[in-house]
Regions:
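Alpha-helical assembly-interface signal, strongest on the long, hydrophobic N-terminal helix that forms
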Residues: 1-90
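Short, conserved structural patches
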Residues: 2-3, 60, 67-205
């Protein structure tokens, strides 16, 4: 009797080990979560790359539109920001007031390269985080620091928040870029405050 039970138990164990039914379902259950993470991760990274490209286009557009004008007033700059803000669509656009903010932020500045020190100094600046006039921008590439010339300098950033927060941080990542252009219509782009036109053709101080 004991031998029979042992033999039956052995056969049951052997048959259980040899039984392949349900193996595929078990493997699939283990693989599905990994596949989902990879899928959503790919989608999020592709979206982030697309947004990053749009941020670059926003920075270039903002500086390019500004550099094509011989002079700008607050209304002109607000229009440039409005046009630039549409580039990020279909992703969330920034709130215009009059410069875009959250999730976008941007600043447009004119820089003057000092003839003596060859440093880029802020002449005027407008945007969601404008730079202080007469301060220096130290990140300008050396090839652009031509003494006595002007630069239109744009800065744009975007807070990209992923739809699924398993791959990227739920708070999102900040994507940013800058662009430099030369004034196209004149030596500099004059900023007109109110109705007063600056007396100096191109201010250096």
């Amino acid at each position: 009797m004991i031998r029979l039970r042992r033999g039956s138990l052995y056969r049951l164990l052997r048959d259980w080990i040899a039984d392949g039914r349900g193996v595929a379902a078990t493997e699939f259950a283990f693989i599905v979560p990994l596949m989902l993470v990879m899928f959503f991760g790919t989608v999020e990274f592709c979206s982030a790359i697309a947004v990053n490209r749009k941020v670059t286009l926003m920075a270039r557009t903002l500086s390019d539109l500004t550099s094509q004008s011989p002079s700008v007033a607050d209304a002109d700059i607000a229009t440039f920001f409005t046009v630039t803000n549409k580039i990020i669509w279909p992703y969330a656009t920034g709130t215009l007031n009059p410069y875009f903010t959250s999730p976008s932020s941007g600043t447009i500045s004119e820089l003057y390269v000092d003839q003596t020190t060859k440093q880029a100094r802020v002449i005027w600046s407008k945007g969601s985080a404008p730079r202080t006039a007469d301060t220096y921008v130290t990140t300008v590439p050396s090839a652009l620091l031509v003494p006595g010339t002007y630069l239109i300098f744009s800065e744009v950033s975007y807070q990209y928040v992923p739809t699924v927060g398993y791959v990227m941080a739920k708070a999102g990542v900040t994507l940013s870029d800058v662009s430099y252009t030369r004034p196209r219509q004149s030596s500099c782009v004059l900023y007109i405050a109110g109705t007063t036109t600056p007396s100096s053709p191109c201010p250096t101080t």
